[in-house]
């Protein structure tokens, strides 16, 4: 989760005093990198995935499942057995926000050959097996986007009660500080977001109104004025960073051949973010309730919203410099490529001094405004030992701001003094239950980048429409019921990367005629006379490629999953979870998820993930039935 510096963290007041210093030197560090590597070309399109996991413990006797606060210990063992022993170990493990979470990636990035698509699932299985092998009896490693009873009494093992005091990190009524990773970055981020904002974060998620759900649904917080003011009727109220950053996701990073190719990919994939997010929807439950949303994006956005009342437009500007329209965790605000420029229709708040400085240093308008927009934010964590740096050889101040702008896409300059290329990160996906599904989504997105570059595809629409799509994508059953703005003619371009833009730029078409509302089924599978469909385009690309039979078979299985999720033939994880709870014998149609219902659900998820049972409505028949890891968690029931 971004920059992990070691040392003594500063309080918000101390960090604030150094904010201008961090910004000033962050820009100098960016300029050093830019001038050193702006002409760097890479032959190979490298890429890699990141999967976040939760550690859970099953109490089969009492029918409870809890999150195990042993992430640091598990991580230490995994690193000791893996990368520290063998630098070429096939897996890498990193800490995540929750002390019940870990993050796993392949040990080395994947390369540009088609056959590497066939190794993704095997590597994910290796990760799952590796981490599972060191867990205790009745514990499991789960890829679940949001734990349904996160923040409910007794959701952790060992059980810890929240202690909502000012001196703590989150001051939460529900989420104890002990559930935050012990690395000082995480608790400092939590505390400093709250202190900068001037109050606790506020998350209100609409509750799903079932037959017996109280109407209006109102929770009372008599002990806490802040919660009483912040909570809304008919909403599930949450008050801590952990409710967002304590969820799991699936991300992919690509290394492009050049900076211009990275900018082109960044823009094209930005339009795809809401579509893939809706397709990967996996988080319908929050704080023990059934919600009316299927994706975590808005929850995580609110959970790290450090904007003051002035910046949110609730009070006149006095102590702050800007009105800021979005949280630090949200969708992108500007396209970076020349062909994206005419679709930049969102008002962009920028630091004008930084923007002018970047222009004077030879940075073009689009990249300058992107960086100047990121740098309207304050640093949230700072370590005493890391204030004065060598700007020519270090990038911590740049990364400090860059890595706490959590957007749908991230444009990543190479680290200083490395041979890494310019990269982009695709960040909107929800993690799926199985390695098969996670591989399918990763391979789909990576293949899409290959096709975008090979066929010079153009998905660009006005950025405000992408934002509207992001809102639709989070709604319940968006994959089947949502309509999304999408470009009609995506095959217009000339040599998009070299020319900096496709021919569409020169056309006299009105932007409004270039796009229309489509269903996800139409976007993914196509509709005669309306849109060719992304999967048919990927299939035609595959037909023209040299691909061995085994790899082709794997890829087709992955694409079949995406195709059927888009058409509704298969359920999203979110839809499947809703049906599971709705059909549970204990469910009273009141939107409440009890301990026992949660236990049944997570146990089933774990059985599916370890291929101990089939789930055709979620996975279809393409799911390969290969037994690959002994489970420590199966109950005798």
Curated annotation (Swiss-Prot):
GO process annotations (BP): blood vessel diameter maintenance; cell redox homeostasis; cellular response to fibroblast growth factor stimulus; cellular response to follicle-stimulating hormone stimulus; cellular response to glucose stimulus; cellular response to hepatocyte growth factor stimulus; cellular response to insulin stimulus; cellular response to mechanical stimulus
Pfam families given in the database record: GCS
Record's keyword terms, sorted: Acetylation, ATP-binding, Disease variant, Glutathione biosynthesis, Hereditary hemolytic anemia, Ligase, Nucleotide-binding, Phosphoprotein
Pathway: Sulfur metabolism; glutathione biosynthesis; glutathione from L-cysteine and L-glutamate: step 1/2
Keyword Phosphoprotein: yes
Cellular component GO terms, alphabetical: cytosol; glutamate-cysteine ligase complex; mitochondrion
Modified residues (N-acetylmethionine): 1
Catalysed transformations (reactions): L-cysteine + L-glutamate + ATP = gamma-L-glutamyl-L-cysteine + ADP + phosphate + H(+); (2S)-2-aminobutanoate + L-glutamate + ATP = gamma-L-glutamyl-(2S)-2-aminobutanoate + ADP + phosphate + H(+)
Source species, domain of life: Eukaryota
EC number: 6.3.2.2
Activity regulation (UniProt): Feedback inhibition by glutathione.
GO MF: ADP binding; ATP binding; glutamate binding; glutamate-cysteine ligase activity; magnesium ion binding; protein-containing complex binding
Chain segments annotated as coiled-coil in the UniProt record: none
Phosphoserine: modified positions: 5, 8
TM region positions: none
SUPFAM superfamilies: Glutamine synthetase/guanido kinase
InterPro entries: GCS (IPR004308), Gln_synth/guanido_kin_cat_dom (IPR014746)
Entry similarity comment: Belongs to the glutamate--cysteine ligase type 3 family.
Subunit details: Heterodimer of a catalytic heavy chain and a regulatory light chain.
Reported disease: Anemia, congenital, non-spherocytic hemolytic, 7: An autosomal recessive disease characterized by hemolytic anemia, glutathione deficiency, myopathy, late-onset spinocerebellar degeneration, and peripheral neuropathy.
Known role: Catalyzes the ATP-dependent ligation of L-glutamate and L-cysteine and participates in the first and rate-limiting step in glutathione biosynthesis.
Protein name in UniProt: Glutamate--cysteine ligase catalytic subunit
Species, as recorded: Homo sapiens (Human)
């Amino acid at each position: 989760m971004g920059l992990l510096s070691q040392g003594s963290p500063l309080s918000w007041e101390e960090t604030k005093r150094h904010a201008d210093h961090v910004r000033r030197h962050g820009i100098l560090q960016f300029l050093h990198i830019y001038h050193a590597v702006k002409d760097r070309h890479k032959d190979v399109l490298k890429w890699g995935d990141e999967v976040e996991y939760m550690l859970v413990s099953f109490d089969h006797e009492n029918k409870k499942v809890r999150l195990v606060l042993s992430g640091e210990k598990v991580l230490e063992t995994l690193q000791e057995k893996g990368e520290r022993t063998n630098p070429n170990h096939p897996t890498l493990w990193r800490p995540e926000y929750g002390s019940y979470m870990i993050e796993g990636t392949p040990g080395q990035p994947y390369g540009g050959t088609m056959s590497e698509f066939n190794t993704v699932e095997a590597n994910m299985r290796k990760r799952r097996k590796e981490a599972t092998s060191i867990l205790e009896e009745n514990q499991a490693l789960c890829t679940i986007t949001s734990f349904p009873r996160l923040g409910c009494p007794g959701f952790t093992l060992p059980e810890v009660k929240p202690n909502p005091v000012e001196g703590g990190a989150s001051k939460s009524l529900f989420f104890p500080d002990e559930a935050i990773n012990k690395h000082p970055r995480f608790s400092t981020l939590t505390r400093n977001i709250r202190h900068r904002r001037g109050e606790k974060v506020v998350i209100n998620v609409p509750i799903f109104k079932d037959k017996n759900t109280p109407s209006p649904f109102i929770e009372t917080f008599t002990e806490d004025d802040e919660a009483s003011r912040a909570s809304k009727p008919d909403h599930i109220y949450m008050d801590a960073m952990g409710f967002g950053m304590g969820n799991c996701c699936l991300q992919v990073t690509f290394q492009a051949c050049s900076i211009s190719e990275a900018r082109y990919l960044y823009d094209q994939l930005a339009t795809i973010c809401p579509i893939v997010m809706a397709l990967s929807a996996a988080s319908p439950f929050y704080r023990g309730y059934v919600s009316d949303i299927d994706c975590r994006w808005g929850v995580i956005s609110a959970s790290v919203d450090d904007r003051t009342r002035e910046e949110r437009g609730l009070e006149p500007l006095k102590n702050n410099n800007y009105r800021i329209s979005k949280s630090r965790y949200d969708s992108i605000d500007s396209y970076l490529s020349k062909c994206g420029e005419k679709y930049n229709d969102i008002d962009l708040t920028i630091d004008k001094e930084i923007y002018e400085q970047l222009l004077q240093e030879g940075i073009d308008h689009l990249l300058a405004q992107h960086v100047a927009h990121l740098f309207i934010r304050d640093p949230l964590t700072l370590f005493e030992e890391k204030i004065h740096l060598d700007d020519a050889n270090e990038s911590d101040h740049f990364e400090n701001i860059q890595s706490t702008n959590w957007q749908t896409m991230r444009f990543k300059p190479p680290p200083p003094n490395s041979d890494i290329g310019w990269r982009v990160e695709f960040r909107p996906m929800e993690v799926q239950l199985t390695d098969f599904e996670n591989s399918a989504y990763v391979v789909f997105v990576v293949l899409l980048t290959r096709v975008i570059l090979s066929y010079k595809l153009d998905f660009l629409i006005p950025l405000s429409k992408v934002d509207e799509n992001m809102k639709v994508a989070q709604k319940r059953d968006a994959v089947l019921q949502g309509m999304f703005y999408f470009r009609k003619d995506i095959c217009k371009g000339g040599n998009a990367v070299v020319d900096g833009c496709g021919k569409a730029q020169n056309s006299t078409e009105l932007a409004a005629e270039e796009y229309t509302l489509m269903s996800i089924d139409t976007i993914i599978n196509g509709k005669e006379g309306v849109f060719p469909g992304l999967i048919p385009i990927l299939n035609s690309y595959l037909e023209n490629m040299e691909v061995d039979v085994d790899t082709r078979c794997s890829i087709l299985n992955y694409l079949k999953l995406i195709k059927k999720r888009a058409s509704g033939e298969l359920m999203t994880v979110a839809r499947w979870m809703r049906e599971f709870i709705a059909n549970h014998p204990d469910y009273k149609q009141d939107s409440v998820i009890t301990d026992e219902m949660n236990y049944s659900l997570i146990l089933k998820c774990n059985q599916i993930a370890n291929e101990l049972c089939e789930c055709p409505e979620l996975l279809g028949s393409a799911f390969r039935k290969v037994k690959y890891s002994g489970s420590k968690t199966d109950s005798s029931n």
